A protein has these predicted regions:
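Acidic, polar-rich N-terminal leader regions of halophilic archaeal proteins
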Residues: 1-176
Length: 176
């Protein structure tokens, strides 16, 4: 499981208000620009916990820890109703991490292709800069991997123009 902070899990409400359970005004602003999900008028993310799950999901993915990445996206996904852009994004990224896991850890490219096809369906219509993640690159790489799985070797997710990698201190956000 992945947590957004050292105290509460992603599914826990903030201040006991279920309607505000994805809001966290303490989450840092974007690394660059004003991506979809950032509200410049309030100076906060629309869903702070989604931003944190995305940051940690990207870091673990880029460290080659696809199962941990999957868990970060999946745990946050449960916070959103089906039919929302947030749900589609998170479900798609769960599939991306699972597909990379199939390819890298199991050399199962048929499984990877199946998961990436599903990921592309979920990510269709999600803005290219959703919560700072470069989804145009994600979609392009998933399509290319269908014919040439080796494009995944060394590929890293980019958020705010950077490709951050999990450090030892990031492990505090993973719980059993």
């Amino acid at each position: 499981m992945c947590r957004t902070d050292g105290v509460r899990s992603l599914a826990d409400p903030v201040d006991g208000r279920m309607d505000d359970h994805t809001h966290d005004p303490t989450v840092a602003p974007p690394l660059a620009g004003e991506p979809t999900g950032w509200n410049p008028e309030t100076g906060h993310w629309d869903h702070g916990t989604l931003r944190m799950a995305t940051l940690y999901g990207v870091r673990f993915f880029n460290a080659g820890e696809f199962h941990a990445s999957h868990d970060c996206f999946e745990d946050e996904w449960y916070n959103y109703g089906s039919g929302t852009t947030e749900s589609a994004f998170l479900h798609g990224m769960v599939q991306v991490a699972a597909g990379a896991y199939k390819h890298v850890d199991f050399d199962n490219d048929d499984g990877m292709r199946s998961l990436f096809r599903t990921a592309l369906q979920y990510l269709h219509g999600v803005p290219d800069d959703f919560y700072g993640l470069d989804l145009a690159d994600v979609r392009s790489t998933l399509r290319a991997a269908h014919d040439e799985p080796a494009v995944l070797d060394g590929w890293q997710l980019r958020i705010g123009g950077e490709a951050p990698v999990a450090t030892e201190s990031d492990r505090q956000y993973l719980v059993d």
